[in-house]
From Swiss-Prot:
Basic residues: bias regions: 98-107
Name used for this protein in its record: Transcription elongation factor spt5
An example Gene Ontology CC term for this record: DSIF complex
One GO MF term: mRNA binding
Biased composition range(s): Polar residues: 905-926
Region named Disordered: 1-172, 694-729, 788-859, 905-1026
Quaternary state and interactors: Component of the spt4-spt5 complex. Interacts with RNA polymerase II.
Compartment(s): Nucleus
Length: 1026
């Protein structure tokens, strides 16, 4: 019985303390049982398994405790086994009907799991049990005494959780975010059936949307993109009027002034940008070709800026000044830099200067304007004139001042600038520039950050810094530690031959940024550039990383330069030169002073400046060396040209002489070998010297042709004398002209002003005044556009006469009166008629009498016609009659040829006829002629041609032309037309053409008297008819 009592579990003391014990449910009441109706038998078996394991553990422990008890017989053991089976069956039924609420475990039962909670979701219940098993159940304080030794270590997991939370609380936010990303982030690629797509298939094609470039206001590209983004938010997809563009972006920089919009149609772009400021969609858009789309979207890696790096300023007062980066903003778009200020503290301020228009460009923005030198900020200087603008500010370290709205710390200007306003590539800071940024340490010495400087120089090393044969060393990369000599350079890749190590003799390629020159102590080197010690020679005494310290050959001082600025050299620095300077070199001391070197010392230079003063300066005080100009020209006191190498003499003063060594503006530096002072160098002015001898035998006199601007105005002296110059107002002023040559060819304008060579023309088309050479202008008629000849000048002969016309003759053309040059008028005593004559007019051809306009004499070239009155057409016979009539007196006005000299008629009284005859005023000369005389042109009865007796003059007495008097007959018809027959014809006379009394067969040319037969030709006797 006692054994059976021990086998039963009566519960712990906790059951007695439980105020609300669990109600016992009747096994017959199925509704009160909290079992799930859908659970199967397998689940029930799994739920009761832990209870079975617990009972077995308890039974084993009790059996161990009762090992010393008396033995029992086999029957009792069988009964015990039966009782155990019955208890297990009751436990199974109790486990199934046990409610959800769990009682607190205590004592030893804490270590045993006697029940399994059943929930609606089996999986969630199992997960909760696993978590409780890991973290451990809650312990009651009273149970601590019942725990065995070491049981308190069960809260190990609690302490571990506390430590984990403390560690997470002490973590940085970035590290915590990284840890969470690693823990909960996606650590594997998404499941996909797609294979790797080649990049060429990702390129845009004609099926993809197009990209349109739209013009916008430069500098407003980002604002336009933000406005498009805002409009897309206002008109999303699915709204009544959605935005149909796909994307929009801008590139800036070289592509400023354009934004790029991706869309299917151009109309969609215009609709999206309609009524938007700073963008011009109505202008011509640019359709980006498909092949250029990848280049448009390609992004280049921006330069990484680090604090302590070196940059230069692009524009403004500090243009090209070196600056050091103090801080970089998180977005990388702005930096804080430290630079040496340029301030004048108001010393050069003009109080009376007018107010500067804010729209105009500020003086500080123009690099050409003189700017103050670089100096550290001085509050003492600022207080002198701008004390009201100066105030002290609190800073973490050093002296901080606010002056004119800017901050100065330890004398440096601290300024916030955008990255696009900085030069970040190929900065190449010089050592003297970096020295100004040296920070003072506590012991008073300067502390120069060479590490950041070297890093900047490595990124800006030029490719031409390495020449074949330079010893180099690879200091970073996979090939670090290799030593060799360069053999060739291709861009930024240098090929070198390894000289040391296992790879000796092999050629390898290395980038320029991973190389540095290698020197050893004792090498003789030369500074090649990038430093103020350029061309300095010396011996290497110390090498430390990228810096080399050498001992100068001339100054015997140690200087430190970068290895990239050095090169091995076999030259020596003790040849009378100090670096790049030699005796007799012309150097620039400042903006207004030049000097000639007269002596070179070990550390200094002795110079003679343009004012005649002797100075001793250091090589660093020289601004630059002036290259001698061999073609420089000046003029001496007499105006003669002087050049380099000419010998000149001083006129006033000491009257020194010498050979011209340098010509600089109005100063001459002369060299005299006989003078020992100042190495024979003297300085004089050009206006105080005269030429003694010119180099090469050049003429020493002034070139007068070049001194006369009138001779040089047309390209040089000419052999012909030009036309006389006119005075007064130029004739071309006010004329309409056209340009016939040059850039304004074909344009028409009006001359507003004119000189000897140039004319100021106001062009009609451009409405502006231009200066054009006169020789390129042609005068035009403003109405008809015809060219007007302007070369005759004013005061030329008037046509038809220079004399004023009389009132009754004014209507004639060309006019009649005193001048006989008129053709064909008549009147008065001056016969202008051709071929007739009248009075003493000698203008007839071949007229007679007065001297002039006669046909030349065949027998004497000095005479025209014959004698003093040789106006007659030549003929034979002593009187040289024209055409026939004997040897009448030539002294009479009516000599033998008075009638015959006319062509072809005669009669002085009927001079109005052209030509005719009339009256009894025929010549009293003999009408007899020899038998073989040619009757040319007529005789006493010769028919006049074409005029008649009362033929009208041509053009007439007054206005009507050609008619004259009322009874005048038209010309050529006449009363007696035949010409030139004579008074008595011989049978063999040539009938040319007819006469008044000609035979019936004379040829009537062109007419004869009124009773003549004009109907047809006449025939001589015996002449066959045609």
């Amino acid at each position: 019985m006692s054994r059976n009592m021990l086998d039963h579990d009566f519960g712990s003391d906790e059951e007695d303390d439980d105020f609300n014990p669990a109600p016992a449910y009747d096994s017959d009441n199925e509704d009160a049982r909290p079992t799930h109706q859908d659970r199967d038998d397998d689940d029930d078996e799994e739920d009761v398994k832990p209870s079975r394991r617990a009972e077995r553990r308890v039974g084993s422990e009790e059996a161990d405790d009762n090992e010393d008890a008396d033995g029992h017989d086999d029957e009792e053991e069988d009964e015990n086994d039966d009782d155990d089976e019955e208890e297990e069956d009751e436990d199974e039924e109790g486990a199934v009907s046990r409610p959800k609420k769990r009682r607190r475990k205590g004592g030893v039962a804490h270590f045993f799991e006697e029940e399994a909670g059943v929930d609606e979701d089996e999986d969630e219940a199992e997960d909760e049990e696993d978590e409780m098993a890991e973290l451990g159940g809650e312990m009651h304080p009273d149970d601590m005494d019942a725990l065995p030794v070491g049981a308190e270590t069960d809260d190990r997991r609690h302490r571990q959780l506390d430590r984990q939370r403390e560690l997470e609380a002490s973590m940085d936010a970035e590290k915590q975010a990284q840890l969470l990303k690693e823990r909960y982030g996606r650590n594997r690629a998404a499941a996909s059936d797609a294979v790797v797509v080649p990049k060429r298939l990702l390129l845009p094609s004609v099926e993809d949307p197009s990209i349109w470039g739209v013009r916008c206001k430069p500098g407003k590209e980002r604002e336009v993109i933000f406005a498009i983004q805002k409009r897309i938010e206002e008109r999303p997809m699915g709204s009544r009027n959605p935005m149909k563009i796909i994307s929009a972006f801008e590139r800036g920089g070289a592509m400023s002034g354009y934004i790029y919009v991706e869309a299917r149609r151009q109309a969609d772009v215009m609709d999206a940008l309609q009524d938007m400021s700073n963008v011009y969609p109505r202008t011509k858009m640019i359709l980006v070709p498909v092949r250029e789309m990848p280049d448009l979207l390609r992004v280049q890696k921006s330069e990484e800026l680090l604090p302590g790096g070196w940059v230069r300023i692009k524009r403004g007062k500090y243009q090209n000044d070196l600056a050091q980066i103090e801080e970089v903003e998180t977005n990388g778009l702005a930096v804080t830099v430290r630079l040496v200020p340029r301030l004048d503290y108001g010393m050069n301020e003009d109080i009376g200067a007018p107010f500067m228009d804010p729209k105009r460009k500020r003086p500080g923005m123009n690099p050409a304007v003189a700017r103050p030198p670089q100096r550290l900020f001085s509050e003492a200087e600022a207080k002198k004139k701008h004390g009201k603008y100066l105030s002290a500010t609190s800073g973490l370290g050093g002296k901080s001042w606010s002056y004119l709205g800017e901050t100065y710390v330890d004398g440096f200007l601290i300024k916030d600038m955008k990255v696009q306003h900085l030069i970040t590539k190929n900065v190449s800071p010089r050592l003297e520039e970096v020295t100004m940024f040296a920070r003072g340490s506590e012991d008073g010495t300067a502390n120069l950050d060479l590490a950041s400087l070297a890093e900047t120089l490595k990124n800006s090393t030029a490719e031409d810094s390495y020449l074949p044969g330079d010893p180099v060393e690879v200091f970073r990369g996979e090939q670090q530690g290799l030593i060799g000599r360069t053999t060739s350079t291709r861009g930024d890749i240098v090929t070198l031959q390894v000289t040391e190590g296992d790879l000796a003799g092999q050629h390898i390629d290395a980038p320029v940024k991973s190389l540095r020159k290698r020197f050893r102590e004792g090498d003789h080197v030369k500074v090649i550039g990038g430093s103020r010690y350029q061309d300095e020679l010396g011996m290497v005494v110390q090498v430390k990383d990228d810096t080399v310290t050498l001992l100068s050959d001339m100054s015997m001082q140690e200087i430190t330069v970068f290895s990239k600025d050095l090169r091995l050299s076999a030259e020596t620095g003790v040849d009378g030169k100090l670096g790049m300077f030699d005796v007799h070199d012309l150097v620039q001391l400042d903006a207004a002073t030049v000097a000639c070197i007269v002596k070179v010392d070990r550390e200094s230079l002795r110079v003679l400046d343009q004012n005649g003063s002797i100075r001793t300066i250091l090589p660093t005080q020289v601004t630059n060396k002036i290259t001698p100009r061999r073609d420089a020209v000046a003029t001496d006191r007499n105006g003669a040209e002087i050049r380099h190498g000419d010998t000149v003499r001083e006129v006033y003063g000491e009257q020194r002489n010498g050979v011209i060594l340098h010509i600089h503006r109005s100063f001459l530096f002369l060299h005299n070998k006989a003078q020992a002072e100042n190495s024979g160098i003297t300085v004089v002015r050009t206006t105080n010297v005269v030429t003694v001898s010119a180099k090469g035998g050049r003429s020493t006199g002034p070139d007068l042709t070049k001194m006369n601007p009138a001779l040089m105005s047309r390209g040089g002296p000419s052999g012909m004398m030009g036309p006389p110059k006119s005075f007064g107002r130029d004739r071309m002023i006010g004329k309409t002209v056209m340009v016939r040559k040059g850039p304004f060819k074909g344009l028409v304008g009006i001359v507003k002003d004119a000189g000897d060579v140039q004319a100021r023309v106001e062009l009609h088309s451009k409405n502006k005044l231009v200066s054009i050479p006169k020789e390129l202008l042609v005068v035009k008629d403003p109405v008809t556009g015809q060219t007007i000849e302007m070369g005759r000048g004013r005061g030329g002969p008037r046509v038809p006469s220079a004399a004023p016309p009389s009132g009754w003759q004014g209507g004639r053309t060309p006019m009649a009166a005193a001048d006989s040059s008129r053709t064909p008028a008549w009147g008065g005593a001056s016969s202008a008629r051709t071929p007739a004559w009248a009075g003493m007019g000698g203008s007839r051809t071949p007229a007679w009498k007065n001297d002039g306009s006669r046909t030349s004499n065949p027998y004497d070239g000095s005479r025209t016609a014959y004698g003093g009155f040789g106006s007659r057409t030549p003929a034979w016979n002593a009187g040289a009659r024209t055409p026939y009539g004997g040897s009448g007196s030539g002294q009479s006005d009516f000599d033998a040829f008075a009638a015959g000299s006319r062509t072809p008629a005669w009669n002085a009284n009927s001079g109005s006829r052209t030509p005719a005859w009339s009256g009894a005023t025929a010549s009293n000369g003999s009408k007899d002629s020899r038998g073989y005389d040619a009757p040319t042109p007529g005789g006493a009865y010769s028919a006049p041609t074409p005029g008649a007796y009362a033929s009208a003059p041509t053009p007439g007495v007054s206005a009507p032309t050609p008619g004259a008097w009322a009874d005048s007959a038209p010309t050529p018809g006449a009363f007696n037309a035949p010409t030139p027959g004579g008074p008595s014809k011989k049978p063999y006379d040539a009938p040319t053409p007819a006469a008044w009394d000609s035979r019936p067969y004379d040829a009537p040319t062109p007419a004869m008297g009124g009773d003549g037969d004009d109907a047809g030709p006449r025939y001589e006797d015996g002449t066959p008819s045609p």
